Amino acid sequence: MTGMPLHRALLKNFLGYAPDWYKLTIFCFLLVNPLLFYFVSPFWAGWLLVVEFIFTLGMALKCYPLQPGGLLALQAMLIGMTSPQQVWHEVTGNIEVLMLLVFMVAGIYFMKQLLLFVFTKLLLRIHSKALLSLAFCGAAAFLSAFLDALTVIAVVISVAIGFYGIYHRFASQQGGNEADISDDSALSSEEHRHTLEQFRAFLRSLLMHAGVGTALGGVMTMVGEPQNLIIAKSAGWDFVSFFLHMSPVTVPVFICGILTCVLVERFKLFGYGVNLPDNVRRVLEDYDRDMTEKRTPQDKVRLLVQAVIGVWLIVALAFHLAEVGLIGLSVIIMATAFCGVTEEHAIGKAFQDAMPFTALLTVFFAIVAVIIDQQLFSPIIRYVLQSSESSQLTQFYLFNGLLSSISDNVFVGSVYINEARSAFENGHISLSQFELLAVAINTGTNLPSVATPNGQAAFLFLLTSSLAPLIRLSYGRMVIMALPYTIVMTLVGLLCVEFTLVPFTDFLMNNHWISLPNLTLSGSHS
């Protein structure tokens, strides 16, 4: 090996342990992009870049998308597809999301003891898998109506890693918390391997139910998703009026989403329906008993402190007392101070999981900058705005859903609501039509986007988390498991936009539950 030529060594180092065919594919992408951009069409080069980036996300288990996606984004800036200034504009425009990832996810890490305590009790008390799935989906939906979906999914990931670690350490006979739970070589028997596979399938289904739950709840309120806030501000709605305007679509979708959760579990469809293995249940029960017996007064105080911080977290986020990232930072400060975590090394561990994804999301904003500079969505937006008022609602809903499933739904929602607001300000559509379009944009952005991990930041965070490889949750598997929800939520949402939105909005208006906001036909919509 010492005599290896330099070019071979470079190829071996390039993207590390990724397969050779994957390395060659990325190399071909980097070769083709400038040729297409300079000699064929910048527009189609932009679309090819979007497809390539989606490919890197799809191959996340072969190679973390930050490196190949980052190389593609860097090249896009170098050849002029976008500029560093535009990328920085996108990054600063989404600074709340980045701060959330840096501080909120780390804050949740310091509440792990309480979360594991609560969810272990929940898991061991509820024996019906359908009921447990319903509890996870419903709890995620409720929390996502008030908290950010990323925060909710970070909680569920933290709990799932805790459960997985407890059984893996038992099965591999590694007692300490420092044991490598990603290494299956130490599993002591074939029975443990089989049980672990079952447990992985069980955790996958719970996580997907929770992930979809964040979308079901997040679409309902103006604080549920970042783009909701942008849409609410543009339409002049407060918390209650936003909920009421959305309810003709979101309430039927929520009911059908919950029914889908029960049906896929009951009939064991699309990878759902796997029960918690008895061996794992016994290990978790033993762990729970052991922890209860060993719990010292200090441990009990830690749980109490974390519970109080949890209440602060929900209240602060629900009433938007500060930006999400700052609330996360306050959680870190209080949890570490009152639980006695003061060593730099111990605090640093909390940031390990979120930082790679934070970097990846920044790369994602570079791709969004290309979409803006090359105006990749402009033809679609122009086409929709030129159609008749009667067909605008369904077209806005469908095109929002399509674009949100391949791009950032915050970006798509922002672009569409700005275009709709401009059309209203220029007198092309009425105020009532603008409000209906705002509902179609919000629901279209949030509901069909569960189809792929690209559309929902919470799904992308789950896919690229340290948990995904542990439970064998790949891009393809996520798409398949999300499929029943995608079909039901998209179709029910579409039918509601088409048939119930207008009459129910009129009903709410006539009964003075909602009223037209005082929007002017001129000026910016800041």
UniProtKB/Swiss-Prot annotation:
Subcellular location: Cell inner membrane
Residues spanning the membrane: 14-34, 63-83, 99-119, 122-142, 146-166, 206-226, 239-259, 307-327, 357-377, 451-471, 479-499
Recorded catalytic activity of this chain's protein: 2 Na(+)(in) + 3 H(+)(out) = 2 Na(+)(out) + 3 H(+)(in)
Keyword DNA damage: no
Keyword terms, alphabetized: Antiport, Cell inner membrane, Cell membrane, Ion transport, Membrane, Sodium, Sodium transport, Transmembrane, Transmembrane helix, Transport
A single GO cellular-component term on record: plasma membrane
Annotated membrane topology: Multi-pass membrane protein
Location (main, coarse): membrane
GO MF terms held by the record: sodium:proton antiporter activity
Protein's UniProt keywords contain Iron: no
A UniProt-annotated Pfam family: NhaB
InterPro entries: Na+/H+_antiporter_NhaB
Family: Belongs to the NhaB Na(+)/H(+) (TC 2.A.34) antiporter family.
Known role: Na(+)/H(+) antiporter that extrudes sodium in exchange for external protons.
Name used for this protein in its record: Na(+)/H(+) antiporter NhaB
The organism of origin for this protein: Pectobacterium carotovorum subsp. carotovorum (strain PC1)
